[in-house]
Amino acid sequence: YATSSHFSWTDATEFRKFCQDAGIPCKPLPVEEYFQPGLCDGAFLTEEYTYDAHILRDYLMEEIAKYPGIKLHFGRKITEIEKQTDCYEVTALHEGKQEAYRAPFVLNATYASVNQILRKVKGAETQDFGLKYELCEIILCKASDKIRNIGFTVMDGPFFSIMPFGKTGYHSLTSVTFTPHKTSYDATPQFPCVGENGNCCQGGFLGNCNDCPGRPESAWEYMSTLARKYMREEYAFSYEKSLFSMKPILKASEIDDSRPTVIRALSEDPVFISVLSGKINTVYDLDPFLD
């Protein structure tokens, strides 16, 4: 981690105190070994945990396989959810055919589609999550040997981070300023590209931005220029590909940049729970509801 000499909300002294107070390992490093002269007032070696989404997915699939009663249905578009006396009936479309599922427990964990799903519920009073939406880009880079096993984050302001991306062998490059391409403050995601002919988001359903012809042009030029402005030349990296995603953010989190897990119970008998988790390490807040 490094604190920028300009336009940062935090300086080196404050960052070191934060780490000490939180019990986070934080070793001061010579700034000039990693960053261009005069741009950072402190650099620190810290320890940060990450995860590989594919490994996590495979683990969960293995756990699910232990329960023969669980069936997974992919590629369904939910059109209606109706509350019955003892269950919810979920109607969905699959390959042009209508399907219906009935269950006494419904968990709405659809991330950026959470409000879209809530608006399909009938027979129960719903409330939208107070969200804004960002159409974001994470750039995957090939990193030189010099940077292969380490990551850089410059803070605390309009800066950047480049760090190992799970076990893919790539580094992810993100920027506070350039990672979000577009922002929507509507209750459900509303962007100029939504509903355009051939685009993936149609009729109240979110698509996959990576497969969409209407996805934005990459901000690689801007992000890489910002990172190279700060980093020494020997810490080289090159563009490999971009990942685009719709990111929901609680409007209440704009003040402190918090990423809580928010859980709302729509009804208890039958059960309908909606969950929006801002970061994977806060998802454990859901355990009491599942128990």
Show the residue positions of the predicted features.
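Short beta-strand micro-motifs enriched in acidic
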Residues: 81-84, 163-165, 264-266
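Central helical "cap/lid" subdomain
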Residues: 97-155, 165-170, 182, 193
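Flavin-binding catalytic cores
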Residues: 166-170, 178-247
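Helical element adjacent to the flavin cofactor pocket in flavoenzyme catalytic cores
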Residues: 43-105, 109-119, 283-291
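General small-molecule cofactor/ligand-binding pocket signal
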Residues: 27-29, 71-73, 238-240
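A conserved active-site cap/scaffold subdomain adjacent to cofactor or substrate pockets
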Residues: 161, 170-174
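C-terminal catalytic lobe of FAD-dependent flavoproteins
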Residues: 47, 55, 221-291
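Dinucleotide-binding Rossmann-like beta1-alpha1 core, especially the glycine-rich loop
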Residues: 1-32
